[in-house]
A protein has these predicted regions:
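Short beta-strand->alpha-helix junction loop in the catalytic core
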Residues: 152-153, 178-179, 196-207
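A conserved catalytic-core segment of Leloir-type glycosyltransferases
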Residues: 41-119
Length: 233
């Protein structure tokens, strides 16, 4: 059975976040067809990267999860001191690296694990192209990386360090056609490079409708509705 490692900055059933949910859904769907291991941090908060969960190996819904500590919490003031400069000038390579460390999660033990165990895995599914773990892993195993960039048209996407790394991955899984166009244009990639994959959904089995909702739906029939889809954290 082929072995696949997922790289994600946070992971867990208690964590809300688009990339985090996507990673967990995909890892759980592939478990059984592949031997899946998730490499992540001990953080639950993406603002501070504070170590909350225990380091080491655990299992969640049958998926092996290996957690590594962040060795520094994020200093938002120091981070924005550098980040805000992106809007005014091109940062040097050294300042970009410093920005990535300050953005975090700064987890060199995770990177060292990939370096020393790279041969143990057939593929690496790497999430979110602007975080430290992703950008450190790609140079080590780029030819086996399936990148899920979860890219937005934001200033971080225009860091020069990305120009060297994104073209080195094996392929890219996009969440939408718009994201595909954004990334392909930004990095001058061939239109055939990467696929729009999105996030799979499993239909619930044997779910009985809530009688209260049936009554409400009947009462509101023909009434214009506004639906909000998002997350609360």
């Amino acid at each position: 059975m082929k072995r696949v490692a997922f790289i994600i900055h946070r992971y867990g059933s208690e964590i809300s976040g688009g990339a985090e949910f996507h990673c967990r859904a995909l890892a759980e769907a592939l478990q059984g067809s592949f031997e899946v291991t998730v490499l992540t941090t001990c953080a639950t908060d993406h603002l501070s990267w504070k170590n909350v969960l225990d380091p080491g190996r655990t299992y969640l819904n049958g998926v092996c999860v290996m957690r590594f500590p962040s060795i520094q919490e994020r200093d938002l003031e120091a981070f924005h001191e550098i980040y805000d400069q992106i809007f005014q000038t091109q940062l040097s390579a050294e300042r970009e690296q410093e920005l990535l460390r300050r953005q975090g999660p700064y987890c060199p033990d995770l990177i060292e694990y990939v370096r020393t165990h790279a041969a143990d895995y057939d593929a690496f599914v790497v999430f979110t192209c602007i975080y430290y773990p992703a950008l450190q892993v790609i140079p080590l195993v780029g030819g086996r990386v399936i990148l899920v960039p979860t890219a937005h048209d934001e200033q971080s996407l225009y860091l020069h360090i990305l120009d060297e790394l994104i073209p080195r991955v094996r392929t890219i899984f996009f969440n939408s056609e718009e994201e595909r166009q954004l990334v392909q244009k930004r990095f001058a990639l061939a239109s055939t490079f990467g696929e729009v994959v999105g996030v799979g959904l499993s239909a619930p089995q044997d779910v009985q409708p809530d009688p209260a909702w049936v009554e409400t739906a009947s009462r509101l029939k023909g009434t214009p509705l506004l639906t909000f889809v998002g997350r609360v954290e």
